[in-house]
A protein has these predicted regions:
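Alpha-helical transmembrane segments and their membrane-interface boundaries
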Residues: 1-199, 207-250
Length: 250
């Protein structure tokens, strides 16, 4: 796609088509797989969760033109990914390849923490952070994830996911400004990698997928959850800026 501009427009749909086809074939002939989970895991790097979050942040800051443009781009990416997934499913069914979506047992809870460490290192590579910033990026990812999980656990009668995401965004926003104030480095070094595990890109992908599968009730429910999580995360970041304001604008 980098060397073929015309291919770049359809790259998201092609990636989804290939990933879904490979998953269905492997599940049908090699080993049973939880197809939806495997497809989502393979496409998660392309799901525009960060773009959706940035769009809501810009709209809430009254940058309406750039915010709506970013929102439109994110929605078009979601539609292309969903189209590729559904097209692959229909093509496999047309040639007689069908695979049941197996419900595999969940991994033990302790596996979350080694996976979190691996994800934090991967995010440092993904953001092309300088070597000196790697410890900060890794710590930010861990803090954001753990704050969100623990915030949801102590939410009581309140909805766990929105409360956890709000507290995670609040803590990361405040820590990013503290880092910018005292280390004289951009607060984005903490903020952007830290919220990457909090952005609801997978929720948006599932909402559009349910809609194209004509499951409108589940699509609407998931879409409302997407909006709730986006608002909670952006509100947390805004209140973090109010809690600790950066002394320097970097």
């Amino acid at each position: 796609a980098a060397s073929r501009p015309r291919l770049a427009v359809a790259s998201d749909a092609i990636c989804a088509l290939v990933a879904t086809t490979v998953t269905i074939v492997v599940s049908a002939f090699v080993v049973p797989l939880a197809i939806k989970s495997v497809v989502l895991a393979s496409l998660i790097i392309l799901v525009p969760g960060m773009s959706l979050t940035n769009a809501v942040r810009e709209i809430s800051s009254q940058h309406l033109v750039s915010g709506m443009a970013r929102m439109g781009g994110a929605m078009s990416t979601l539609l292309k990914l969903t189209f590729g997934t559904i097209a692959a499913t229909q093509l496999c069914a047309a040639v007689g390849i069908t695979a049941r979506d197996f419900a595999l047992p969940a991994l033990p809870t302790w596996t979350d923490y080694p996976a979190l460490l691996v994800a934090a290192i991967a995010f440092a590579i993904l953001f092309r952070a300088a070597r000196r910033d790697w410890p900060v990026v890794i710590l930010a990812v861990m803090v954001g994830f753990l704050a969100t999980r623990w915030g949801g656990a102590i939410s009581g009668s309140l909805p766990g996911a929105p409360v956890g995401v709000f507290l995670g965004g609040l803590l990361l926003g405040a820590l990013a400004n503290v880092y910018a104030r005292f280390a004289h480095r951009p607060g984005a070094v903490i903020r952007e990698p830290g919220i990457l595990l909090l952005v609801p890109g997978s929720v948006g992908f599932r909402s559009v997928s349910f809609l194209l599968e004509r499951d409108t009730t589940l699509s609407l429910d998931t879409g409302l959850l997407l909006i709730t999580l986006l608002v909670s995360l952006v509100a947390g970041l805004m209140f973090g800026d109010l809690l600790v304001s950066p002394r320097r604008s970097l």
